[in-house]
Amino acid sequence: PQPGPAAGESGMSEVSVSSGASNPFADIVTLDELKDVASECRRCRLCETRKTVVFGEGNPKARLMFIGEGPGKTEDETGRPFVGRAGELLTRIIENGMHLRREDVYIANVVKCRPTVDGLGTRDRPPEADETAACSPFLLRQIEIIKPDAIVTLGNPSTRFLLKTTEGITKLRGTEASFEGIPVFPTYHPSYVLRNGGDSSPLKKDVWADIKKVMAKLGLPLN
């Protein structure tokens, strides 16, 4: 299987949603309002096993968005995205590599509730296509409200969803694509890097090469 935040394939290629489609949340104009709606969401089966809706966090006017797959155990418990081991690595990339504060960017996931294999929280899995489709209006509206100058997709699910492709992240990383006119830079999910050597993994160098392209696009200093 292609590398991603969890083993297995997610079927993202089956999903066909764009911001041009009718969004049930189109009249919502702030992230706080959208978060309130998301907190009561029952649009898919993930609501039955979640502890918390993990909406996203960061600067509502961020120039840069990071979009991952879905919450894990720690995120489900805290209500915050990317706060486990993968989140620690992402935070280091943002703060030590890009010389930004985590609160300067916006971090979200394709789905807002934790997908697990058995619904009991023993093992995470990629979201199913119908779960992504059900949750996608939240992400699409987040993008519309924030209006970022660039998006970094982390792993297969978010990359395949935004770019409407069946290609895997191994082929797509290192390239620049576009979603609704916004530059998109696919790269490996931090958890995949951690599972394959962490700080000593050559994948980390690949991620850093991808991030430098983002920085150049945004006009950020590289030293």
Where in this protein do the model-derived segments appear?
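A polyanion-binding, active-site-adjacent surface
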Residues: 1-223
